[in-house]
Swiss-Prot record:
Protein name: Probable nucleoporin C890.06
Disulfide bonds: none
Any one GO CC term of the record: nuclear pore inner ring
GO biological processes: protein import into nucleus; protein localization to nuclear inner membrane; ribosomal subunit export from nucleus; RNA export from nucleus; transcription-dependent tethering of RNA polymerase II gene DNA at nuclear periphery
Taxonomic superkingdom: Eukaryota
Assigned protein family: Belongs to the non-repetitive/WGA-negative nucleoporin family.
InterPro entries hit by this protein: Nucleoporin_Nup133/Nup155_C (IPR007187), Nucleoporin_Nup133/Nup155_N (IPR014908), Nucleoporin_Nup155 (IPR004870), Nucleoporin_Nup155_C_1 (IPR042533), Nucleoporin_Nup155_C_2 (IPR042537), Nucleoporin_Nup155_C_3 (IPR042538)
Subcellular location: Cytoplasm; Nucleus
A Pfam short name: Nucleoporin_C
Organism annotation: Schizosaccharomyces pombe (strain 972 / ATCC 24843)
Keywords from the UniProt entry: Cytoplasm, Nucleus, Transport
Coiled-coil parts of chain: none
Residues passing through the membrane, by range: none
Record carries keyword S-adenosyl-L-methionine: no
Amino acid sequence: MDINDPSFSSTENGIYELLSRGYAAIEAATERDLKLPELGDIIGQVHAPEYISQVLSGWKPFYLRSVVNIPDRIFEQYNRTECFTQMGLFAEIQRAWITVDNRLFLWDYLSGQNFQAYEDLSHTIVNVKLVRPKANVFVSEIQHLLVIATSQEMLLLGVTIDEKTGELSFFSTGIQISVQGINVNCIVSSEDGRIFFSGNKDPNLYEFSYQLEEGWFSRRCSKINITGSVFDNFIPSFFSFGTHGDGIKQIAVDDSRSLLYVLRETSSVSCYELTKNGVNRCVFYSFSSMISQAQMLNATSPLLDPRTTQIVSIVPIPAYESQQIYCVAITSTGCRFYMRGGRGPISHYAPSNSTLSSTPPSTLQLTFVRFPPPMQVENYASSRNYPANPFFLQNQSTSQQQPERSSAVKTTPMKCSSLSNIYTSDLFFAISSSNTNEGDVVCCTAPEVGRIANAWQSGTQPSLIESSMYVPIKGFVQDIKCIQNSRERNELVSQFNTPPPTFAILTNTGVYVVVHRRPIDVLASAIRMGPSLSSGIDGQVQLFFESVGRAEGCATCLGIVSGCLDQGDFSHAAANFSGSTTKLAQADLLDIVKKYYIEFGGKAFIDQSRYNNQYDSSSLEFVRLSGCHDGLASSISRIIRNVWKNHVIIAKKMQNKRIHYAPAFNATEILKIQSGLLYLSTFLENNKSFIEGLNSPNTLIGSSNVADEIAVQAEHRALSALLLVLQQIVEGISFLLFLNDTGVSDFHEIVSSTSIDIQKSCSNMTFGEFFTSKRGREVTKELVNSLVNRHLQSGGNIDMVSQLLRKKCGSFCSADDVLIFKAVESLKKAKDTVDIEERQSLIELSYTLFKKAAHVFTPEDLRLAVEEYKSLNAYTTAVNLALHVASARDDRNQALSYLVDGMPENDPRREPFESRTKCYSYIFEILDSLESQMSNDSSAIKVDVYDTIQRSKDELFHYCFYDWYSFKGLTDRLIEIDSPYIQSYLERNSTKDMKIADLLWQYYAKREQYYQASIVLYDLATTHLAFSLEQRIEYLTRAKGFGSCHVPNSLRHKMNKVMLSVLEQLDVASIQDDVLIAIRGDMRIPTSKREELSKQLDGEIIPLSDLFNNYADPLGYGEICLSIFQCADYRGINEILNCWESIIKTTHENAIISPVGSSPVEAVSSTLKNLTLRFSQSENVFPIEQIIDITERYAFDQQGEAVATGWVIDTFLGAGVSHELIFIVLNQLYDRREKPWQGKDRLFFLIKEVTHLLKLWHEVSVRAGVAQTSKPSFDAPLVLEAIEKYKNALGAPDTATKSCKENLISLDSEIRQTY
């Protein structure tokens, strides 16, 4: 048994569906961000909307973070009018610079410190540029090159930075070229280190080429004239001094497309392709063509007058920001000319999905003109007096397409300089000179990305919505640089993982640090200023949500929660707001955004456009989720964006052809990501009860609005999935960091110790897959195993590893795998040791460790462990482990309730039930094994195992154990078990198992619980189980017997009620048994039909009505019909009399056709006697008057010599009917003389019957030897009166009546003598 066996798995099967759903939501959010329209789509409309000029300071797109004055020493140098000076910024090394003749001074522009100078030059410095060095030319410490151009030469200085002190060091590279005759005015470089430059009034473009060493046909460094002829490279520059031509004003490089743009004095633009071997011009765009196209697009405007307008700057637009727009030209009037690139005739509004290959463009064409906001001199001039309070700058609303405005505020056209530029995310800085001597004017514009995205997502064609403002500065702008940049074109994404774009504006008075407010900063700023406004915080937040949409508003709130806020803005705002109501602490701000995330996130709803209003299980897929969900998905995707699709581990092939594994992540970066996600996870966990969809999926169950109920369930499912993914990513990052810094073994050793398959998965797996896929968990498990192996080999404490894993990433990677590993190691040692005590100690240790990890055991894990314990004869330990694992796999005890509820189909509790029963099956295998062994040792072990089982408090196990007993044919043993669970087991199974049902009443009877036994027997007799009728009668008979047994007084009343039911059912069952016997012996019925009817009757007890209607009556079983009437207390006299008549008739007919036996009259007499004996006590089925009447009529019809007179009277007297009752009935028949008792013959027949009765009655009443109490009462006066009546009726005797009259006279005399 090996921990590396794949059967030992710590995966939780229930989470993968949620993880997959959460992964899909993050992917969808990422896709939404990627599909945000690019610049080329946004400017597709010719007319852009007006600029938004925010009056409230918190909504302004930029704020002034700080101002750092120029050091006094530098300021003095700059103000020397006799010197040639220039100033600029090196943002890459956080330095400002100034040249004074042949000297170069640098200082840290953020602190005003770290002053340094370079004074080793002989000639006046005319230009300076900081560039990247070419690869593999200089030592690795040199990360930057300083290109210094003087009037005579251009040289390269290596620059290094001390990481601790920040000090700069300069190193001479010995690389320089002559630029005599070229007054260098522009130097640029590409990312790969190529350096290009131009000279003032010089039409040529040059490249400063250098390499590591000189070659056969190339020098180490040289100046290459790119745009001139081949011979120009061999002619000294001073020969061309004074050459007139179309000079170059600016050079710009687009590294993303390998293009170089040249802006000339005539405002024409040339585009060159940068190749490995040189530069090729591919496009020339004249200024006149631009202006013509601009006027076509925007009609006539003074700002487009070619006589007063020129191009002052050309700005490449990187391909990652736009695939369509290649560059933007900025005019002196502040207009921006957006140009598309193409390879042939192009449309002004080409769609963004038009694929652009890597080939250079053959055309550039202006497709959109953006006019500047108006320049308001008065307001701007006044704002210069308050440079330290940027929150209260006053800008006015502007109009885009109407440059000429009539307004109370005086506006003048801009006079933009070449320093005007467009930076990341289309942030535009226009540097314009003013008509005063106070300095330059800085106008900034920024796209309203949130509004643009909201318009696009709502299905509206987006347009370039921008806000604008003027930044108050003092002095004249010397340079402007972006010191915080991002390559992400979507600011909604970049605000989650990069600082806000920050700009340093260098003037002759100081450095102004200006920061762009992203949507996240705007929201925070608006909230902070809310208390001081009449609309309050509610109004400010609502305005923000309306502008960006619910989902983006929620995402922005979560961005603040996750720590993405610009703290500089927060601190600066706190210092500038006045009044107690505006001083919001950071904690207050977080509470506020949490509140609005919940309140303004909206609710999920069913999207009727995709849904047919049929509420079924699939309808959850038609729910449009809330802004809370979409905002959360966007937040997670943006925070994790930089690594989500990246590989976790990289495999490098070394020189020895071996593979070396290393982490593909930066620990600091993923730690920062984890921090943001941890904030989100904590927020969601702490506010679960307030967020609809996370509090409970059953909030609206039972609501009359089914649509709302479905929507809440869908929201809960989606938010729970995201929360799970969030937690898994946080813990997954902890695991990777732990793996990378274990202190035991390096990363490569851990990965390379796994299987080849796992190693391949490691090198191919992305972060997203690693965090959310099942394969990712498998890889994680193997890495943990490898880590444990390495740790054990180094003699480390495995408990420490387990504790650290459980603490850092307990649910992502199971620390319990470590415990399992140690437990398995203990078992291996136990098998190898010969010392009994040590072996037992190791077995107990392994059991303790297995118990701690039981909740991650799979059935296969348990099987392997049980097999190991069996091999060590530790059967009891194996049983205990199986019981513990079963309980751990179902910690909420769902399996038992599933069994008790009847195991409904499609119930989620079925899985834990099957998991537990699988664990129990290993115990039963142990029992089977022990039962098959015959040794004395096995007997002792068997006793211990059964004792362990008996002591178990696992109710479900006991039920399964009893099932196993039944399966083994040991059912009878169950009633011998003394367990608190056996009774409930027997009770539950008695309704579906005949044997168990039969055991249950015995169980009660054995424990003298006769009331319960009677109930069970009654239930058995009336159950649907396949008992025979005989068994049912037996059960009812036994129950009847228990009714006379002793029961507690509290149960006697209940027992009596049960007995009533038992007796009723017993009567019915007896009648049914009579019908069954009758049918089986009824030869009139065909054999097949007889068998069918017998099968129907030999089972469940049938209601009396069914017995009568379906069997007894149709088959002519009169006696049984009378039994049914009696049992049912039926009083329908007609049906009852018909039944009696039918019995007499049937008996007579059967006697006639019978070849042997008595005469018909004798047969009828016998039948009547038996029926009278049986039913005479039931008035409803034995109406004596009518029965005697029917019988006498039959007797009259059957008169003959062979038929004795008075046999009817003899029959009823023999059945116990009194003389007096018979006399009364016959006397009434005579007196009423109803049909058929009319006519002389019939009346004479009745007189003979009465005479016979009276004679017998008198004889009995005077018979000697009979006790007086036993003699029937004899009403002599009534009898004598009747005799007199009958004698008179007979009249004069004739032959027929003579004998009868003589008998009456004789009887009269005897009675008179006796009484």
